[in-house]
Amino acid sequence: MKHIRNFSIIAHIDHGKSTLSDRLIQVCGGLSDREMAEQVLDSMELERERGITIKAQSVTLDYKAQDGETYQLNFIDTPGHVDFSYEVSRSLAACEGALLVVDAGQGVEAQTLANCYTAIEMDLEVVPILNKIDLPAAEPERVAEEIEDIVGIDAIDAVRCSAKTGLGVDDVLEKIVSAIPAPEGDPEAPLQALIIDSWFDNYLGVVSLVRIKHGKLKKNDKIKVMSTGQVWGVDRLGIFTPKQIDTTELNTGEVGWVVCGIKDILGAPVGDTLTLAKNGAEKALPGFKKVKPQVYAGLFPVSSDDYEAFRDALGKLSLNDASLFYEPENSAALGFGFRCGFLGMLHMEIIQERLEREYDLDLITTAPTVVYEVLTTSKQTIYVDSPAKLPAVNDVAEIREPIARCNILVPADYLGNVITLCIEKRGTQVDMVYHGNQVALTYDIPMAEVVLDFFDRLKSTSRGYASLDYGFQRFEESNMVRVDVLLNGDKVDALAIITHKDQSQTRGRQLVEKMKEFIPRQMFDIAIQAAIGNHIIARSTVKQLRKNVLAKCYGGDVSRKKKLLKKQKEGKKRMKQIGNVELPQEAFLAILHVGKD
């Protein structure tokens, strides 16, 4: 047991986590050279395409150290993006140490900081590593000082390596063995295993990634899931060397996968504890804190026949992604679908793409909203996650919107631009500290503004140098209104948005103009209106297509022309009474982009 090392790799986006993990696998011979690919651990097609890590993955490697001993290294690759920070906290719960990878050219960024603090709170040993020293722009000395300055951990003798060229990777492995403590646990105690992750395999059912804290787990053991009390037999278990390898048992301190033939998706919730059915452990392990979704959007299948398939797909995805929340919803315009909760806009895009790719569905998304706290006139507090659920204007005493505490790290040159952006997003400054050339800004900004496009705008105003980390802070009273969209006088529930009173005029106008571009012309006029309550704030009209009925009159009497035009007008009027408007998918997407340009 003293030869086991469990660790994960934390870093900001694009600082080279996945490449470093490739090198570690290669040096320890986990895969032959033929099977080696770039970013082995980013196994999802989508991850490879976007070049980001979404799911935490685990690998078990054997490393023969310089002291002649062979160590078993279990490591978990984690995502770096702020939307997936919950994946990081889950991975850290299974480890004793973490490698803090910092790009020697870019220096410390906000996410590095956030994940690092999470690790320190969990009492992990944090080992700083300076990556990308092969780049001409690398300044390892400056960055090492920056790490000490901002993060506050000792970084003078930090390992320097280049994951791309393989330089210094051996030093990294030696450092892991020397600096990270061995797991503590009692092999004789009753089994306690923490479920770090689970996913659905079409042949095996639910596969769970577990970390054995105490005791050991053997094939054919009867185990109990502590939250549900269900008992299962262990069919197969093993480790990843990125490939799934079967073994006969998992010992204390190890990380591996278990298949118990669980068919039900809710059978093995993430963060749960497994124990033996006979003389098992009394109490469960402390799991991770449940994450609250920050952004909600309606997802609807384009054809209503897909509803069942859509429901199953969501179930399977939510098993793999503990932070996805969903409940059934129906809309007059779009039929039956689900209201889903996400951690941020990137998370929402990823989930939608995974549903469309992996499960072959066509989906329409409505505009994303955050959760508002509403105090009604009858002194009730309700939480509203969709514009349709907002009570009527005269029943609302006050609407409180969620405020996010944003920590931004930005080079001093771009400070002005970033502050201007924060003010435009209705932010209030909390704190500002200079660390050498970097400035740490703390702002309170409404969540609705942050999740919409704050990240993209921040990157573009600072030429990509600023970095952001945010978390929910509190609810605060604010003057919010619901803007409804009417087509020919009928409300379209799926198009409503909640926005701040000051911006409602411009938002409404933009919305209407955008919709006008995307609705195809019909045989009659379509009036698109934006309204707050009964007050119309903007309107535009999609003009009708009409036949030239006067083409066959050469010269002739004016009353003849009038008659023909009047006849046409009456026909159009009749048409308009029974006609309904088809809304293309683009019209819904247009709403997502309102206020971005």
Swiss-Prot record:
GO terms (BP aspect): positive regulation of translation
Catalyzed chemical reaction(s): GTP + H2O = GDP + phosphate + H(+)
UniProt GO molecular function: GTP binding; GTPase activity; guanosine tetraphosphate binding; ribosome binding; translation elongation factor activity
Domain tr-type G: 2-184
Functional summary from the UniProt entry: Required for accurate and efficient protein synthesis under certain stress conditions. May act as a fidelity factor of the translation reaction, by catalyzing a one-codon backward translocation of tRNAs on improperly translocated ribosomes. Back-translocation proceeds from a post-translocation (POST) complex to a pre-translocation (PRE) complex, thus giving elongation factor G a second chance to translocate the tRNAs correctly. Binds to ribosomes in a GTP-dependent manner.
NCBIfam families: lepA (TIGR01393), small_GTP (TIGR00231)
Chief location category: membrane
UniProt EC number: 3.6.5.n1
Alphabetized UniProt keyword annotations: Cell inner membrane, Cell membrane, GTP-binding, Hydrolase, Membrane, Nucleotide-binding, Protein biosynthesis
Subcellular location: Cell inner membrane
Family membership: Belongs to the TRAFAC class translation factor GTPase superfamily. Classic translation factor GTPase family. LepA subfamily.
A GO CC term assigned to this protein in UniProt: plasma membrane
Matching HAMAP family: LepA (MF_00071)
Protein name: Elongation factor 4
Topology class, membrane: Peripheral membrane protein
PROSITE patterns named among the record's database cross-references: G_TR_1 (PS00301), G_TR_2 (PS51722)
Domain of life (superkingdom): Bacteria
Annotated positions binding GTP: D14, H15, G16, K17, S18, T19, N131, K132, I133, D134
Stored InterPro entries: EF-4, EFG_III/V, EFG_V-like, EFTu-like_2, G_TR_CS, LepA_C_sf, LepA_CTD, LepA_IV
